[in-house]
Curated annotation (Swiss-Prot):
<dbReference type="InterPro" id="IPR036457">
    <property type="entry name" value="PPM-type-like_dom_sf"/>
</dbReference>
<protein>
    <recommendedName>
        <fullName>Protein phosphatase PTC7 homolog fig</fullName>
        <ecNumber>3.1.3.16</ecNumber>
    </recommendedName>
</protein>
<keyword id="KW-0460">Magnesium</keyword>
<dbReference type="GO" id="GO:0005739">
    <property type="term" value="C:mitochondrion"/>
</dbReference>
<feature type="domain" description="PPM-type phosphatase">
    <location>
        <begin position="43"/>
        <end position="309"/>
    </location>
</feature>
<keyword id="KW-0464">Manganese</keyword>
<feature type="binding site">
    <location>
        <position position="88"/>
    </location>
    <ligand>
        <name>Mn(2+) 1</name>
    </ligand>
</feature>
<dbReference type="Pfam" id="PF07228">
    <property type="entry name" value="SpoIIE"/>
</dbReference>
<keyword id="KW-0904">Protein phosphatase</keyword>
<dbReference type="InterPro" id="IPR039123">
    <property type="entry name" value="PPTC7"/>
</dbReference>
<feature type="binding site">
    <location>
        <position position="87"/>
    </location>
    <ligand>
        <name>Mn(2+) 2</name>
    </ligand>
</feature>
<dbReference type="GO" id="GO:0004722">
    <property type="term" value="F:protein serine/threonine phosphatase activity"/>
</dbReference>
<dbReference type="InterPro" id="IPR001932">
    <property type="entry name" value="PPM-type_phosphatase-like_dom"/>
</dbReference>
<dbReference type="GO" id="GO:0016311">
    <property type="term" value="P:dephosphorylation"/>
</dbReference>
<feature type="binding site">
    <location>
        <position position="87"/>
    </location>
    <ligand>
        <name>Mn(2+) 1</name>
    </ligand>
</feature>
<feature type="binding site">
    <location>
        <position position="232"/>
    </location>
    <ligand>
        <name>Mn(2+) 2</name>
    </ligand>
</feature>
<comment type="similarity">
    <text>Belongs to the PP2C family.</text>
</comment>
Length: 314
């Protein structure tokens, strides 16, 4: 992914299939603190997080809630379960900027907003707006840009609310089939919509998309549904059919089974990203846009949040 800048002669930076061979790895179950006001009969999400960085982290880089230039958060409130992923735009590396820091700070701001008393869990787009405003209005804001995909499951009506800006995204899987899938927002090939805080002296050089441009959706959920949020490192390398074949192999929906399934998805996406002969979704899109690309997968950071909708046993 790149930063879109006005008057740049080339919008695509080629990826070398041999460039990234080592991936750092992190996964985990999420421990939830009890929530006052939450009914013991409300539906809830069993959630795991899995991911890989496309290359080893540099010394001192914080690993918490980051996979390379990707970031994520999960939050639980009395009204809703909330999760989000963000993909820092890699083009900032050429300007000497940590491309993942902006994504990390954006997710941190969004997570903090969920703890405010007026958060009702039904508008992740408003959550994204508030999180971005908090980040961009700091006295010394973090420079950079990222995509963002947020989702909330409101407990009382068991409804999934989403807001997606860029080419990260979400899936809802029911009975082995994709029930809903987000649609990418792009300016051009490999140039997604992105939230941006530009350098103070170069504001006119950047296209700055607004959080209000995020696409919002609403979907009723049922017990047993799977909700998946991921960055483009997954979607650019793994066909939907391959993803479903792994998810449909889950025998149970407990944390251990979900974590095993999420790990298999990430490992397979990593494998495909390094396969120079694989006709990946990214390679297919490049061909559709008449972009010269040697084919194969696209080495990238991969972040995945996988949740199963559950109801308390009586």
């Amino acid at each position: 992914m790149i930063t879109r800048m006005k008057n740049w002669p080339c919008l695509l930076k080629r990826f070398s299939i041999q460039q990234f061979h080592q991936f750092t790895h992190l996964s985990g179950r999420l421990e939830r603190a009890p929530q006052s006001g939450k009914s013991s009969r409300d539906p809830y999400l069993v959630t795991v997080v899995q991911g890989r960085s496309k290359k080893p982290r540099f010394p001192g880089e914080r690993s918490n809630q980051r996979f390379g230039e990707d970031s994520w958060f999960v939050s639980s409130t009395p009204l809703a379960e909330v999760m989000g992923v963000a993909d820092g735009v890699g083009g900032w590396r050429d300007l000497g900027v940590d491309a993942g820091r902006f994504a990390k700070e954006l997710m941190s701001c969004c997570s903090g907003q969920t703890q405010l008393s007026d958060f009702d869990g039904r508008s992740p787009r408003n959550l994204l707006i508030a999180g971005f405003q908090e980040l961009s209005h700091r006295e010394q804001p973090v420079v950079g840009s990222s995509t963002a995909c947020l989702a909330t499951m409101h407990r009382k009506d068991c409804t999934l609310y989403t807001a997606n800006l860029g080419d990260s995204g979400f899936l809802v899987v029911r009975n082995g089939r994709v029930l809903h899938r987000s649609v990418e927002q792009t300016h051009d090939f490999n140039t997604p919509y992105q939230l941006t805080v530009p350098p103070e002296d170069r504001k006119e050089s950047y296209y700055c998309d607004k959080p209000e441009m995020a696409v919002s959706t609403r979907h009723s959920l049922l017990p047993g549904d799977l909700v998946l949020l991921a960055t483009d490192g997954l979607f650019d390398n793994m066909p939907e059919s391959t993803l479903l074949s792994i998810l449909n192999g889950l025998k149970e929906r407990g944390e251990r089974d979900l974590l095993e399934g999420a790990s298999r998805v990430v490992e397979k996406a990593r494998e495909l990203s390094l396969n120079a002969s694989f006709q990946s979704p990214f390679a297919i899109k490049a061909r559709q846009h008449n972009v010269s690309y040697s084919g194969g997968g696209k080495p990238d950071d991969i972040t995945l949040i996988l949740s199963s909708v559950e109801v308390p046993s009586v």
